[in-house]
Amino acid sequence: MTMTHDLSGTILVLGGARSGKSTFAESLFKACGSAAYLATAEALDTEMTARIARHQSRRGNKWTTLEEPVDISAAITRTRDPLLVDCLTIWLSNLMHLEKDLEMETADLCQGLQDHDQPVVLVSNEVGGGIVPENKLARRFRDEAGLLNQRVASVADSVYLVTAGLPQKLK
């Protein structure tokens, strides 16, 4: 049985590492003539450079790529096309590294999503299902990621959890 998923409103796609969440999120745009891809990752090492290249080659040329590691609220506001944001947890890591006010940044993001008049799909890692991290920074990241996902899910029209390439609609 093939399920169809509509691209409308704000959609949050959650999943673990290599769960297929980005591939699923991209598939939501297959009926779009054009779309924007907001990348939050920076190519700071060879592994991340290779990961970014894989994502770019998979997407094809209908996408306009915007690179914004920190101020994604402003980037969402400027974009007039359907938009894919990949990924919120890398954005969170960038904010933590810069010691930004996470509550304020998340509130700005949620407001921007509510004000946006085009579909927005956001990809984020679900990191809270494993063991308690050993170090303080990793525990804080896990906790902040959980809070971020909750806040975005609360304003999203739809939420999916992707496991082993299989999307489950939660909301």
Show which residues each predicted segment covers.
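Charged, low-complexity C-terminal accessory regions
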Residues: 1-12, 38, 160-171
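SAM-dependent methyltransferases
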Residues: 1-8, 82-85, 105-111, 119
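Short secondary-structure boundary segments
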Residues: 15-16, 41, 87-88, 124-126
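Residue-level signal for inorganic ion chemistry
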Residues: 25, 55, 84, 125, ...
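Helix-adjacent hinge/juxtasegments
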Residues: 57-105
